[in-house]
Design a protein with these regions (language model features):
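Generic structural motif
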Residues: 20-24, 81, 144, 174
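Sec-dependent N-terminal signal peptides
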Residues: 3-18
Length: 201
């Protein structure tokens, strides 16, 4: 409950962001609280902040994940300079950081949403690469939001989250998050469905 209140206070203290939301996600053995802050590119120091806190009892390795990103361009072409920092904070306040930078290509965009592709240099203690697909599509009461990371480290990894939302009333959405992960690209995929309650602030 304390983590939920902390994230609500964070959301209330970031009025400059144009889209703020809090999510509660629950799956088998998992319980997450997520805060998301979005802003129009070029209009703020950071365009996107994502904070995910895991308060499930089984998690003894990592408690909080933070992603901060910035998109910038000085031309009309649909290509952005994209940079981000990802931080994993353990329960004993141990920290692992990942730094990414590279071009973000706007594959399609319009009133319904967008599809973007990021091809980035990745540094997590050693130099490597990462490819990320992003998409947000909203039609009526329905919203589909996804991202998929394919990256190298000591081997090839993949992580994808697909969120489906239905707007029940203004500011309240319910839905599901389908998480697909592979620790090594040749191994079997781990599929994890989660129920989601989203509050748009």
């Amino acid at each position: 409950m304390k983590k939920i209140l902390i994230l609500l206070l964070i959301a209330a203290s970031v009025p400059s962001f144009s889209q703020n939301s809090i999510w509660l996600e629950k799956g088998k053995g998992d319980a997450l609280v997520v805060a998301e802050f979005k802003h129009t590119p070029n209009d703020s120091i950071f365009n996107y902040i994502y904070v995910e806190s895991d308060f499930s009892k089984h998690n003894d390795t990592r408690s909080t994940y933070v992603l901060i990103s910035r998109d910038q361009k000085w031309w009309k072409a649909p290509v952005w300079v994209h940079g981000e920092i990802r931080t994993f904070v353990g329960k004993n306040f141990t920290m692992d950081n990942v730094f990414l930078i590279g071009p973000m290509f706007e594959l399609t965009g319009g009133k319904l949403g967008f599809i973007n592709l990021q091809t980035m240099y990745r540094y997590d203690g050693k130099s490597n690469f990462q490819i990320t697909f992003l998409s947000d599509v909203e039609y009526g009461r329905f919203l589909y939001s996804m991202y998929a990371d394919l990256y190298g480290s000591d081997r090839l990894y993949m992580h994808s989250e697909n969120r489906f939302f239905f707007k029940v009333i203004p500011h309240i959405r319910i839905g599901a998050n389908l998480v697909l992960t592979n620790g090594e690209i040749s191994e079997d995929f781990d599929f994890k469905p989660m129920a989601v309650l989203r509050i748009d602030l």
